[in-house]
Amino acid sequence: MLDKEKKAEIINKFKLHDTDTGSPEVQIALLTERINNLNAHLQVHKKDHHSRRGLLKMVGQRRALLNYLMKTDMERYRAIIEKLDLRK
């Protein structure tokens, strides 16, 4: 789970303007951080299937946001992929 400071840091890094908290970039960055944390948890707790289901749901949500961003603005999509290092 993200604490307030970490969440604020991520929002500040990816926001488009001063009061931005809900742009696709911010949402994708927050989901990516939560996914990475949950992934580390599942490496240790392999049989935690409830958390695995939540992880899959978050990955699907991030995928939908990325698809939306790709359809609306390809340049912003490429920038967020590059910043978060999502593609290998």
From Swiss-Prot:
PROSITE patterns, per database record: RIBOSOMAL_S15
Matches recorded under SMART domains: Ribosomal_S15 (SM01387)
Keywords: Ribonucleoprotein, Ribosomal protein, RNA-binding, rRNA-binding
GO molecular function annotations of the record: rRNA binding; structural constituent of ribosome
Pfam families tied to this protein: Ribosomal_S15
GO biological process: translation
Function: One of the primary rRNA binding proteins, it binds directly to 16S rRNA where it helps nucleate assembly of the platform of the 30S subunit by binding and bridging several RNA helices of the 16S rRNA.
Annotated HAMAP family: Ribosomal_uS15_B
Quaternary structure and partners: Part of the 30S ribosomal subunit. Forms a bridge to the 50S subunit in the 70S ribosome, contacting the 23S rRNA.
Protein name according to UniProt: Small ribosomal subunit protein uS15
Organism, as annotated: Thermoanaerobacter pseudethanolicus (strain ATCC 33223 / 39E) (Clostridium thermohydrosulfuricum)
